[in-house]
Amino acid sequence: MILPINIYSDDILRLKAKPLKGVDSAIEELIASMFESMRNASGIGLAAPQVGRSIRLLVLDVSCVSKCEHEKPMVVINPHILSVRGHNDMEEGCLSVPGVQGYVVRPAAITLKYRDEHFAERTGEFSGMVARVIQHEIDHLDGTLFVDRMEKRDRKKIQKELTALASGIVDTEYPVVEREVVPIAKPT
């Protein structure tokens, strides 16, 4: 089932998500829906808070990205970055901040402890695009958006777009969470 995506300024995107205690049929269904929603929106990563669930769960599939065709889709539950190496600056975008892109510096490689879709504990080394997407999605689990990590001068350049999103002006080809926009009353 395709789920609507929460958009910039939705409160759930600023909450620290709660750890999962296990995987049941409801979580399995959520995982399948998250993959379907992510692919429908032409995304390569999606965190549960983006679809209205404040839990520490993310999915990613970078196989559509050039030079990443060999990468398999991943389910990451309760992630914890154990170590980081190097850093690089790359342009990012986000399904929750549609139409906005900006450069973000992130570690180039990470060692990650997490649980998979079967809730089996794993530790893995990730680099390149996979490391970047994992870090971007973990930020969602911690209530951080990529625009928060942009240089101040670069963020000023996108302020108009962020203001439009915050006021409910959203143009996407995928479903987003509808919200009531309350107009500011003009003085009489």
Curated annotation (Swiss-Prot):
Q: Where along this sequence does the record place binding of Fe cation? A: C94, H136, H140
Task: Give the protein's cofactors.
Answer: Fe(2+)
What does the record give as EC number? 3.5.1.88
What UniProt keywords apply to this chain's record, in alphabetical order? Hydrolase, Iron, Metal-binding, Protein biosynthesis
Does this UniProt record's set of keywords contain Protein biosynthesis?
A: yes
The reply on keyword Iron is yes
Q: What species is given as this protein's source?
A: Pelodictyon phaeoclathratiforme (strain DSM 5477 / BU-1)
Cofactor stoichiometry and binding remark: Binds 1 Fe(2+) ion.
Alphabetically, the GO molecular function entries are: metal ion binding; peptide deformylase activity
Name used for this protein in its record: Peptide deformylase
Q: Where is the active site?
A: E137
Query: Coiled-coil stretches, from where to where?
Result: none
Pfam families recorded: Pep_deformylase
As for what it does, the entry says: Removes the formyl group from the N-terminal Met of newly synthesized proteins. Requires at least a dipeptide for an efficient rate of reaction. N-terminal L-methionine is a prerequisite for activity but the enzyme has broad specificity at other positions.
Concerning its family, UniProt says: Belongs to the polypeptide deformylase family.
